[in-house]
Amino acid sequence: MSHIQVFDTTLRDGEQTPGVSFSFDERLTIAKQLEKWGVDVIEAGFPASSQGSFDSVKAISETLTKTAVVGLARCKKSDIDAVYEATKDAKYPQLHVFIASSPIHLEHKLKMTQEELLENITENVSYGKSLFDVVQFSPEDATRTDLDFLVKCVQTAVDAGASIINIPDTVGFSYPSEFGNIFKVLIENVKSDHEVTYSAHCHDDLGLAVANSMAAIENGATRIEGAVNGIGERAGNTALEEVALGLYVRRDHYGIETNLKLDETKATSDLVASFAGIRVPRNKAIVGQNAFSHESGIHQDGFLKHPETYEIMTPQLVGIKSSELPLGKLSGKHAFAEKLKQLGYDITAEKQVELFKQFKSIADKKKNVSDHDVHALVQGHSHETNAAYQVETLQLQFVSEGVQSAVVVLKDHEGKEYPSAAIGTGSIVAVYNAVDQIFKAPSELLNYQITSVTEGSDAQAQVNVEIRIDGKTYYGIGVDHDVLLASCKAYVEANSNHLADTARKDGVVS
């Protein structure tokens, strides 16, 4: 069978999902799980964009031993230098350099002629090649670029030393036959004295990212880019787990295999969903809760007689266990640590002590603590510790019909407490009014969403909030058994994110 490379951009393009911002530790943990899953290449970040991204890419480069690490760069020498410095200690460093090629980008964003663009490609790809053995070039918005000019751009990049050409459907504009034809034309017309790998990077604006990626494979692409669970800006990226299982289940048609360990797929999906704070839709292909459920009586009858009547793959193939051994109030530190390890978390001993205390609190309230509860526990702890303040106490009191009084005490990382009291038409409004008095930043609540982490009346609640301050949007996530406490935690994190943003602008936080 032929082999195709899997290029994961969860930590770069995936993190551009509105409301998603991975911490340093979360990025490192995800990178380790991606390597365990078996991806060939990880796009660890955009080093020139921020010190945080640079540090994360550097740490990932120094940690991974089997997976190539890529840094993204614009066609600018300073960007390329930043990638070099961040990835120079990687075992397999790669550079991904890009510049837009479509008429609308040339005219309105870059203010360049086609000739100037080709000169820019030559200059920066050749500079990148002087620092890296492997250079990938992407003509941004390739699918809205005239095909003849796209061939010129790619030929120019190949002549300058690029050995990987990535074709991005940046705005999810293309459809399978058109996208596949782009690869066919490029492979037939671009000449090279060295081997060139063609890669596909699709967005899901029209719901065609996976279909377009498969069409690219059918027309010669040997590298596919995407993100776990298909996360990414706007409608998201190609869902890598869907491509992987599509190739495996229909290997009779494609004749192509990946290096992915398919039984690590569900664990990888759950880990990313937990850190991103985005629940996987129940009907999501491959990893959704309903992916292996059968509701129809006819389907159930057939499935019970022979599973293959209505299942083209087994839950075990993607790592879904037929039975789960839940933790309980009698579970000790060792069992809890082992569960964290099973779920893909690489957590310091100090943090494990903190998490174990919270776990015991949950176990006292629930008969069984499921894997989803543990994911929620880690996620909630991560969001709380990343916030500038933590919720110390929360008290509510009925004042009169429709009016509640809330007393909130927040604590900063140095242990200083900030009390506040307020009233409001309802408990949530009262709590948020009290928090507003502490942060002193008038905000507008744009979205408030509450979901149950698990089934049952004893389930933990996850609250996602979206607020606007000074015209900018901030997000927060809170997890707790108590809905009001989860709501308060989410609102505090969103306001903390605004505080951190303001500090960065003032030069306080790098």
From Swiss-Prot:
Q: Which GO terms describe its molecular function?
A: 2-isopropylmalate synthase activity; acetyl-CoA C-acetyltransferase activity; manganese ion binding
Tell me the residue numbers annotated for binding Mn(2+): 13, 201, 203, 237
For region Regulatory domain, the annotated ranges are 390-510
Top EC class per UniProt?
A: transferase
Cofactor list: Mn(2+)
Q: What keywords does the record list, in alphabetical order?
A: Amino-acid biosynthesis, Branched-chain amino acid biosynthesis, Cytoplasm, Leucine biosynthesis, Manganese, Metal-binding, Transferase
**Domain of life assignment:** Bacteria
Protein localization: Cytoplasm
Q: Which SMART domains does the UniProt record give? A: LeuA_dimer
Identify one Gene Ontology CC term for this UniProt entry.
Answer: cytoplasm
Q: What is its EC number?
A: 2.3.3.13
Q: In which pathway does it act?
A: Amino-acid biosynthesis; L-leucine biosynthesis; L-leucine from 3-methyl-2-oxobutanoate: step 1/4
Give the chief site where it resides. cytoplasm
A GO biological process of this protein is:
L-leucine biosynthetic process
Keyword match Manganese: yes
Residues annotated as domain Pyruvate carboxyltransferase:
4-266
**Reaction catalysed by this enzyme:** 3-methyl-2-oxobutanoate + acetyl-CoA + H2O = (2S)-2-isopropylmalate + CoA + H(+)
Sequence similarity: Belongs to the alpha-IPM synthase/homocitrate synthase family. LeuA type 1 subfamily.
Role: Catalyzes the condensation of the acetyl group of acetyl-CoA with 3-methyl-2-oxobutanoate (2-ketoisovalerate) to form 3-carboxy-3-hydroxy-4-methylpentanoate (2-isopropylmalate).
Q: What does the subunit section of this Swiss-Prot or TrEMBL entry state?
A: Homodimer.
Fetch the PANTHER family from UniProt: 2-ISOPROPYLMALATE SYNTHASE 1, CHLOROPLASTIC-RELATED, HOMOCITRATE SYNTHASE-RELATED
Task: Indicate what this protein is called per its UniProt record.
Answer: 2-isopropylmalate synthase
Q: Which organism is it from?
A: Staphylococcus carnosus (strain TM300)
